[in-house]
């Protein structure tokens, strides 16, 4: 099949997107498809209409690729694509909607979820620029359970751009100012410590299944932008090392199952399809969900590739399956 790989784009994640696209193209060739590389620009519609691909794979990271923009356009053009639909992408892209979707899923099913998420608040830039919200920064310590340190992050940005750990009021002010340069909405929430994990998922609905959780260990500092972009500054353990979860093997296995269940709850709550990743932290008592990715990188040094390898799956085989679906 002729598959258009949409890559590049103009977001802060352009370079990562190009690397992801090249990996996907190589995998498609190995799976005996005919890939067409398209660097997303103002000529995209004309290029797609001229190329007439059988389907598309969105490899654009960040805005446009993960917020439903490209997916909506492909819907309008009548071109099938791999992964979740445009409405799902729009919901997933906004991290501030996580708790609402999870609560709705819990109410619908009548069951208590095992997934949890950090408590916090979301503010628009207008509140700080025009309504004087900086004058209430001192209240965050009391309003968010546990107080400092606090996590500050743009609501709709990836690769941890604009994410900060604020240890006091002054750091919080600086973190807010920086985060607002990336997005008009910013989240301030509990800072969660623990085992950092990513659970990649294949399939849709009740047929979706989790691949082995990948443990993420930065060699220095936090797993923020530099660590996510540099393959030589972070180690992936797939599956997660049991000793990282508990010294007792049976307890660790039970925790791993709970982590996988939590990721699947989030995936299904948003109505995701095809493939995706759920990033979370095991804090020693529960799985704290941080964010969801509808277009995870398939680059050679990525959590998705690590999870596939741990499952005995090849990226070409996974892509072939996604295209056929």
What are these regions (language model features)?
Residues 1-7, 48, 91-194:
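Active-site nucleotide/adenylate-binding loops and adjacent lid/helix of ATP-dependent enzymes
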Residues 35, 80-81, 117, 150, ...:
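Hydrophobic beta-strand scaffold residues
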Residues 248-325:
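ATP-dependent carboxylate activation and anion-phosphoryl transfer catalytic cores
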Residues 1-97, 101, 105, 124-138:
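ATP-binding N-terminal substructure of ATP-dependent carboxylate-amine bond-forming enzymes
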């Amino acid at each position: 099949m002729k598959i258009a790989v949409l890559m590049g784009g103009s977001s802060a994640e352009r370079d990562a997107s190009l690397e992801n696209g090249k990996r996907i193209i190589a995998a498609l060739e190995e799976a005996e498809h005919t890939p067409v590389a398209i660097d997303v620009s103002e000529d995209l519609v004309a290029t797609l209409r001229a190329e007439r691909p059988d389907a598309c794979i969105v490899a654009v990271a960040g805005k446009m690729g993960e917020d439903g923009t490209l997916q909506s356009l492909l819907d309008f053009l009548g071109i099938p694509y791999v992964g979740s639909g445009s409405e799902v992408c729009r919901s997933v892209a906004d991290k501030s909607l996580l708790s609402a979707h999870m609560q709705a899923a819990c109410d619908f099913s009548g069951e208590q979820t095992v997934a949890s998420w950090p408590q916090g608040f979301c503010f628009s830039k207008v509140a700080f620029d025009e309504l004087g919200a900086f004058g209430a920064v001192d209240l965050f310590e009391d309003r968010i359970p546990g107080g400092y340190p606090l996590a500050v992050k743009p609501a709709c940005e990836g690769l941890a751009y604009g994410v900060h750990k604020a240890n006091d009021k002054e750091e919080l002010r600086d973190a807010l100012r920086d985060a607002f340069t990336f997005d008009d909405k910013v989240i301030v929430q509990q800072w969660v410590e623990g085992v950092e994990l990513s659970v990649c998922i294949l399939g849709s609905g009740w047929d979706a299944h989790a691949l082995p959780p990948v443990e993420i260990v930065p060699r220095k500092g936090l797993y923020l932008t530099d660590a996510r972009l540099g393959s030589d500054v972070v180690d992936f353990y797939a599956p997660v090392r049991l000793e990282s979860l508990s010294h007792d093997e049976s307890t660790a296995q039970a925790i791993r199952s709970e982590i996988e269940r939590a990721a699947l709850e989030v995936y299904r709550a948003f109505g995701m399809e095809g493939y995706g990743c759920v990033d979370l932290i095991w804090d020693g008592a529960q799985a704290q969900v941080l964010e969801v990715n509808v277009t995870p990188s398939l680059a050679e040094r990525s959590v998705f590739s690590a999870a596939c390898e741990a499952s005995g799956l090849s990226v070409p085989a996974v892509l072939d399956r996604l295209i056929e679906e």
